Structures are given as C-alpha cells and as structure tokens.
C-alpha cells in the first residue's frame, strides 16, 4: 500500500515538469516555434525586397486582416498593392523582445515584439521605434495573421 502510494505521488510530481499541452495536442512550445518560424520567414523576405515581402504577406495573412499602422487601418489587398507597386517600403534595423502567448486551447497566438527602422508609403517616410502586436489564428490547420497593430514606443522608453 505504501509503495503504491509513493509511486502515485512520485508519478504525479513529475507531471508538473511536462510541457503544457493544448486541446489540439500541441504544446505551447511547439506553437511558439511555429509562429516564430513564420516571423523568421518574414525577416528573410525583408532581406530580399518588397516583392518577397508581398508574397509572404499574401501567404500568411487572412483575407480580412485588420492592419493598423502609420497610415491608419488598411486591408490585406491595400497593403499588398502598395508593396507590389513600390509605394510601400519597410526597412527594419533592429527587431527584438519577441514573445508569443498561446490562447484558445492552442488556436490563437499573440506575438509581440519591438522594432526600430524606417517605413515609407508614398512620399511619406517614418523613422520608427514601435511595439508590434500580431494575432494569429489557426484556420484549416494553418496559422494566419488576423490582426497587425503597431504602436509608437513612448519617448521615455526609446533606446531601452
């Protein structure tokens, strides 16, 4: 009896060390790695030019994406058009402080990070230090970005 009780206690204590698993069978770590792989793919596309970024954008964003940035709320179609026409350019200098939070039993992931660089649309160029929030949803087994929001880093937090 004591041996059985000890075995149960030991087994249950080790369960706390296992990675949390979502209802879809994936761990938070696996989901984080999937989201970061998409982000790394975007970074690689940025190094190849705006046409490559537009291709990435088309693959990884929902058709009804809500994209909020310097020029305001824009659609996926508007952003892709501006990228392909040469009207929009993004040049990150430093991107860091990545964090992924998993929600909805593994069906939603929120990616936050900071970025410094320049963004231009039309004849307007913005130097920026931004907080970025991207919300991804798992649709038909694939992660798609459904919300992108960029907010300026307050002056007293810049350079940190």
Regions found by a protein language model. Give the residues of each.
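Bacterial N-terminal signal peptides
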Residues: 7-16
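Short, low-complexity N-terminal intrinsically disordered segments enriched in polar/charged residues
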Residues: 17-60, 156-160
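Short beta-strand edge/turn micro-motifs at domain boundaries
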Residues: 129-156
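Beta-strand elements of well-folded, non-transmembrane domains
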Residues: 117-121, 136
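A short hydrophobic beta-strand element
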Residues: 107-117
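Bacterial N-terminal signal peptides that target proteins for export
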Residues: 1-7
């Amino acid at each position: 009896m004591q041996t059985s009780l000890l075995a149960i206690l030991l087994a249950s204590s080790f369960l706390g060390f296992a990675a949390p698993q979502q209802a879809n069978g994936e761990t938070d770590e696996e989901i984080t790695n999937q989201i970061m792989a998409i982000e790394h793919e975007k970074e690689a596309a940025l190094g190849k030019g705006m046409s490559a970024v537009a291709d990435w954008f088309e693959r990884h964003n929902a058709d009804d994406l809500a994209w909020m940035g310097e020029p305001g709320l824009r659609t996926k179609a508007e952003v892709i058009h501006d990228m392909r026409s040469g009207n929009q350019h993004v040049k990150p200098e430093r991107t860091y402080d990545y964090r992924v939070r998993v929600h909805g039993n593994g069906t939603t992931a929120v990616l936050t990070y900071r970025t410094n660089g320049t963004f231009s649309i039309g004849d307007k160029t913005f130097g920026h230090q931004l907080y970025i929030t991207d919300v991804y949803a798992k649709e038909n087994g694939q992660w798609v970005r459904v919300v992108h929001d960029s907010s300026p880093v307050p002056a007293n937090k810049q350079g940190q």
